[in-house]
């Protein structure tokens, strides 16, 4: 099976190796680049819990002054793995869904325990900080990275893709979906995806690509990528 992955290499290198070990052909089309955002200095010692909704949020955070034994809430297993790699020991992970993450926080962190810091990228799909504030929590959102659309792609890669279109393509965000649509249109690939299954996180992401004719569209949570191989 031919699989197209679209995340930055640091977010999908393990998946590339895994899929190749299963005998699949894997192509890599990084649609977005991740860049650190400089932010104001924050005294992290005053927070009693930390929330991460992506691995990138962990990578770009200056951890000086932060007690790594505090409760660390992660949106999914990959983010939790990244957090543990940076020394966090008291981690709690949802199943790749921000709404599930909110419920985990409500169940495992009492608002009387103190302040929460929510570390994220510039663009988010769910305003988790506002939702928690509406529940009475004291939450500070810290934006420490942004996503930038890649605009230059290797012509040799594009020509090879036209000759061997993927059976599956994984898209992880509305930003990525918009970038993929732009890539498809710019390279006049609109009519070539009718035998490709589109795998998206959430309906809002898949909606960005509805004008392209796909074989089927599947919605999934992070961590379910391998399971989806057996659904088509």
Feature map (PLM): residue ranges:
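Signature of uroporphyrinogen-III synthase
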Residues: 1-232
């Amino acid at each position: 099976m031919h699989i197209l992955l679209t995340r930055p290499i640091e977010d999908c290198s393990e998946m590339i190796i895994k899929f190749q070990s299963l005998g699949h052909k894997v192509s890599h089309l990084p649609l977005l680049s991740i860049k650190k955002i400089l932010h104001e200095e924050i005294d992290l010692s005053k927070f009693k819990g930390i929330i991460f909704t992506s691995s990138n949020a962990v990578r770009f955070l200056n951890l000086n002054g932060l007690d790594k034994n505090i409760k660390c809430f992660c949106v999914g297993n990959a983010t939790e793995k990244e957090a543990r790699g940076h020394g966090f020991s008291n981690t709690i992970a949802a199943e790749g869904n921000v709404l599930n993450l909110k419920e985990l926080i409500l169940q495992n962190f009492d608002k009387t325990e103190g302040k929460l810091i929510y570390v994220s990228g510039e663009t988010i799909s769910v305003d988790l900080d506002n939702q928690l504030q509406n529940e009475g929590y004291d939450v500070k959102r810290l934006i420490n990275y942004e996503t930038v659309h890649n605009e230059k792609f290797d012509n040799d890669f594009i020509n090879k893709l036209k000759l061997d279109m993927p059976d599956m393509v994984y898209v992880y965000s509305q930003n990525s979906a918009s970038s993929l649509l732009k890539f498809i249109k710019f390279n006049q690939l609109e009519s070539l995806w009718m035998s490709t299954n589109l795998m998206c996180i959430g309906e809002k992401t898949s909606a960005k690509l509805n004008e392209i004719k796909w074989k089927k569209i599947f919605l999934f949570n992070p961590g379910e990528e391998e399971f989806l191989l057996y659904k088509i």
